[in-house]
Amino acid sequence: MRPVCTVVVDGLPSESTSSSYPGPVSVSDMSLLHALGPVQTWLGQELEKCGIDAMIYSRYILSLLLHDSYDYDLQEQENDILSWEKGAYKKWGRSKKKCSDLTLEEMKKQAAVQCLRSASDESSGIETLVEELCCRLKDLQSEQEEKIHKKLEGSPSPEEELSPTAKDQVEMYYEAFPPLSEKPVCLQEIMTVWNKSKPCSYSSSSSSSTVPPASTDTSSPKDCNSESEAVRERSSVASVPMHEKAQSRSRHEKESKLSSSTIEEKPAFYKRQIRHKPEGKTRPRSWSSGSSEAGSSSSGNQGELKASMKYVKVRHKAREIRNRKGRNGQNRHSLKHCGKAERGVHAGSGGSSSSSSNGSIRQLCKRGKRPAKETGRSDSGNTAVKDLYVDSRNNKEYKEEPLWYTEPIAEYFVPLSRKSKLETTYRNREDTSTLTAEAVEDLSDSVRGLCISNSNIHRTYLAAGTFIDGHFVEMPAVINEDIDLAGTSLCSLPEDNKYLDDIHLSELTHFYEVDIDQSMLDPGASETMQGESRILNMIRQKSKENTDFEAECCIVLDGMELQGERAIWTDSTSSVGAEGFFLQDLGNLAQFWECCSSSSGDADGESFGGDSPVRLSPILDSTMLSSHILAGNQEPFSNINEGSGINSCFSVFEVQCSNSVLPFSFETLNLGSEHADSSANMLGKTQSRLLIWTKNSAFEENEHCSNLSTRTCSPWSHSEEARSDNETLNIQFEESTQFTAEDINYVVPRVSSDFVDEELLDFLQDETCQQNSRTLGEIPTLVFKKRSKLESVCGIQLEQKAESKNFETTHACSESSPHGDGYSSGVIKDIWTKMVGRSSVAAVETERTGEELFSTDVNNYCCCLDTEAKMEALQEPSRAVQRSEYHLWEGQKENMEKRAFVSSELSKVDGGDYTTPSKPWDVAQDKENTFILGGVYGELKTFNSDGEWAVVPPGHTKGSLLQCAASDVVTIAGTDVFMTPGNSFAPGHRQLWKPFVSFEQSDMPKRGENGVNKGFSFIFHEDLLGACSNFQVEDPGLEYSLSSFDLSNPFSQVLHVECSFEPEGIASFSPSFKPKSILCSDSDSEVFHPRICGVERTQYRAIRISPRTHFRPISASELSPGGGSESEFESEKDEASVPIPSHVDVFEDPQADLKPLEEDAEKEGHYYGKLELESGKFLPRLKKSGMEKSAQTSLDSQEEATGILPKQNQCLECNFNESLEINLESSAANCKIMTQCEEEMSEFCSCKAGCQFPACEDNPVSSGQLEEFPVLNTDVQEVTRNQEKQSWWEKALYSPLFPTSECEECYTNAKGENGIEECPDAKETPSREERLLDFNRVSSVYEARCTGERGSETKPNGLHRKMCSSASSDTGDTGSEAGGEWVGPSREELFSRTHL
């Protein structure tokens, strides 16, 4: 029996390698074994001389040397894994070369020598012994070969006749030892197991197995086999998801059924297989046999394997299996769904879905019998199979399987579409007749979490998220399969092998935020990038494939990467502009605001693709492809090419470009990017730092991520171009604050599912058309009459100094712009676009060229080259933006947004407000950029080496708080953040705060050579009302989902975001820089779960960036939202602009600027955690007294500067102060606590009061308690207060802008919203209360967070502070003093911020 065993063990493997002649091989092996006796005896003696156990080692060494098969795959995998661990992303080819450097014989000798040396104390003589042994064995073998030759030449000797063939031996063995399982034994399977003819057997098994690895209930055949077999087929197993293994049992049953029929066919098939190697034939056998086929069948499969090798490397056996399954039949489509591996195989794993059912499996087997060509033909006809697959997939959502990561992925199959196997198995996409398999595959490649919806409206969640630099970014992206995806452009990010190879794991470490298995980082993870993890590969995919994505539904901003330009805002008319516009570095488009929180769970993905990081990133709320975005229209994808879809597509999310952070509404970013390619580039070019906010890790201190995502906690990541994708996502850009266009591989904005795809498409188209802005250089030439971003977002028309001002819309720091590392403002743009509906004024973190600041207004100026297109887009606001992120527009969606944009023609600013160095703008503004981040309007200083600032011209009308906010521009200069009240420009810019750490220029300013790759901190006012305040809802019923998003209420939808962008250098050193995102949750633990404010409300993530974020509050007065009227506002702006220079002086002391933030931090400590505060550099200053002083100082300094508040603001301050005093008096009479509250209330009244009561430590009482308790205690007092407030509100801010009732309403609303106790006030001022309540519902959540964060500071003050750098911070404390100054604006703005 030993000979038989030996033959089986030794002979079969050799047989598998030798292929179809098991008999002769076995005979020769047997004869050789018989002749080994003398050699073994001699070897034993020699070993004994060396002190080595002869019994053990003689047989082992002989086995080593005689074994003629070597598992290169295993070695390569091992090497790859090791190399990956070492951070050297080596391509499989390299490892192969290394492996093949030594001949098999040399390797065996080496192994034997090593083995003996390990067993012997003496190392001398071992090599000689082995050499001699090898010589003896060679002699023996030659002798045996001669004998065999003679025997073969002559008639078969009786001995030979008697010797059983390998097959006979197997049969004899199983007769003697029948299998325990009922499953009929397939000799071929057994042979395969023994033979280890991996490629052949695997390929055949894969082809034979009709079950798609991920899609089918039954696991791949190999799973059916033994673990050992699985090990041999480890690559296939690796590709096969764990669930497949679970399915393996059912598959076993099926196989047993099939095997009964197929086994009978096997003998013939076996022979035929060897001859014809038809995939189909092999498959039936493999089905019956499981994954393994007989050795000969495996040999037969070799031809098959070769074919598959075109698409797949041998290692991707599972993939091959899937592919062959697909070839078996039907599943090219399924293959698309199954994954990149299947997709790589042209036939795809269409059959995999069908294999879920026995019947389908049988069909597959039959199809497998067909020639490959036949099966390929049948693919199109396999609708039934497709349906089965779809059903199976629908029944079972593919979950990420540990095997994907734990099992070595041998050769990663790099499908043409560059789908990673992991992606493939991770989510199988439904067959989408509308989508080409490649397109869908590409999409899934780029966005693992992308949800692809069929034209049948099957929404496929490709993945929960995307892997970015080892980060698994959760972001279900819903892609409307109806959307026309051209080729693989969709999501196949041009995997930049260069990047991958150049990037080391160390760079990717921070992406572990997502708790991704290290294996995900495994090079196996990345098909395209052989040495790189699939995730990295996805993240790093570069522009190579980006071009392909143009037509694809790469909502992931495939076009973003266009020419390294920002494609986000690309208009369909100008693809180049869109790309560049989209993000200077799509790589920087790491972050989005996943503002469309509730409407699309998938959209909720932190990054690019909804919840799961779509190719464009976590991710996260910002689903690159939102089902609703894409579902309604295929346009988004086409729009991507056009670039128009991009804006609408991206829900409000922040896109971190190397040089800019852009909040995009995914809708805005929607494939509308003129160049799907661009988005792909954005995704693939750079490691996209899609900090998929799947984890709070983004907020982890070491992450240095400021998670600002309004909805998703998405951090604004600034990462250097070289950053790993996840870093890119990290708002902090921990190591490299700037993205290169290359850096951003994926931007996945969240899109609310609710968002109508058509709306998104329309919105995207409009925006992208407008955003066809080219690189920064192109944009400057454009004069945009479009609304400025601020206008769009805020619905505030910024004064356009002159349309002649060429907005060099920095396509979100268009990649072309010099400071690629700089933060692009593309992110902001989308957010604003969404927030303001069409006028997304996302201020972009400015890299020095204002490129990072591209017009956020997709419609307004979209930084798009085509000003006309932009104008058009502005006029026709896309519905997608606002709605997708926040689901704000669920009701009216497109019309609403259009209305918002149209109504808020405010945004008709010449160019993008923020995009260019202010050259096109008036001189004062030349060096400023206004930006809206996450709905926050900020003015950013773009940092060219010359220090130009891109500024937003003052808005014409300020219909909403955002407009008011627009007046207050946060300008972030290299190290300073300036706030321009009332749209005051450069002269009036007041330094909001100086970064605690000076922003150092990143070493990564690839994009912006002069670009300041410095962390920026800014305070964002997010006014979802934005343009909406101006826009009237055509249908009264169609109101924003968020009652808080009240068009009539200027305060509603103002998000106060403080975020700091900090370059990686700073990030690592400045824990304080790490912004904390408060996602509508009171505690950090809740950060990831945005709270839904109001039933219909969109979930807003209040992003409260702690002082750590280095945000200085912007005072409401600075924002001068009310300015009483547009004229007032403008005058205010003008006035502010004059005095503003003093403001800058005011905050010359960076610490002074930080004090309010510190105060906030102290108050907000419970939100951020003591550790963060303590670790933060602000902590020492976080003392209430210090905070109060600083706040007062800030207010005083602001007042002194008077630049902060224009005269009107000053008047407002006086009015506010008076009103505050009055309120205080009345409230004091009513309630002692109310006094402070009144101050606070007066200052911020509604929002703060409502939100603040929880945080009423010192002053919070004033606003929150006052409103809450006094309301409860003395409604009259509250009413009086409200009236007073109304008076001063009216007088100060809103008398012109909003009727007192409105202010009152807002005030009451905030109170009611934030504190139930405020309801009495609400009752008293019902109209205002309603709005405020709606607003407050949203704001209350945010404020609650903020309140916790701000602690004693009244929430409104906190928001106010954020809004207005210093004064706002202490508004609560200095409510009566400086509060008056800030009260009006701060209430409005604070309310807005609080609201968000």
Swiss-Prot record:
Descriptive protein name: Uncharacterized protein KIAA0232
> What terms describe the molecular function in GO for this protein?
ATP binding
In this record, what's one Pfam family? DUF4603
Provide the binding site for ATP: 88-95
Which positions carry Phosphoserine?
817, 1083, 1197, 1339
Compositionally skewed regions (Low complexity) per UniProt: 198-221, 286-300, 1365-1376
Q: Where is the composition biased (Basic and acidic residues)?
A: 242-268, 1386-1396
Q: What keywords does the record list, in alphabetical order? A: ATP-binding, Nucleotide-binding, Phosphoprotein
Chain segments carrying region Disordered: 146-165, 198-388, 1113-1137, 1347-1396
Task: Tell me where on the tree of life, at the top rank, the source sits.
Answer: Eukaryota
Q: Does the keyword Phosphoprotein apply?
A: yes
Keyword Phosphoprotein appears in the UniProt entry: yes
The UniProt regions of compositional bias labelled Basic residues, in chain numbering, are 312-327
